[in-house]
Amino acid sequence: MTVRSALIASTLAFMLVPAPRALAQMVHNDVQVNPDSLIQAARDASRPFLDVNNAADGHYFPVLGCVSGQQDGAMGVHYLNGGYLLDHGVVREDQPEALLYEFRNGKATLTAVEYIVLAEDWDPDHPMQPPALLGQLFTYTSFPNRFGLKAFYSLHVWAWKNNPIGTFVDWNPTVSCDDAPTH
């Protein structure tokens, strides 16, 4: 094998192997072996907040207003626990960083939880490896982004409302922002 052909072969091999961040962006569907354990963990962690009036007791407060997609439905209104977000990259199934609520007819319904890890907290100790929770990989969102956040990893778990396109997909086509309050 010539040096030139070896260089071409190694370049092609490198191009065909997705980088961990690219993998984290691509793999967000139901790829874990047992999704029920993560769904149950998310329900256990968020059960006290089924009533949105209890969210503040858990230090969850509304941010961003209702997040909707251009074609893919919405996420809903995020209630964020800043302490969990700023915990230096700790991933715990019993401490979701955000609760997602859908508002319809003046009533808030808990639909999902979101686990969020800032890339600057995760990457130094876990180079080339996206976070995972109970086998489910997080997705990567670069900076700049529509949320105004630094680069981050996230994992949505539609624990309280069925998502027909996947339990761990970011957007839910059955969620709407039409009745959401403007914060």
Feature annotation, model-predicted:
Residues M1-I8:
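Bacterial N-terminal signal peptides that target proteins for export
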Residues A9-P18:
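Bacterial N-terminal signal peptides
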Residues A19-A24:
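Sec/Tat signal peptide C-region and signal peptidase I cleavage site
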Residues Q25-H183:
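Primary mode marks residue(s) on the alpha4-beta5-alpha5 output face of response regulator receiver
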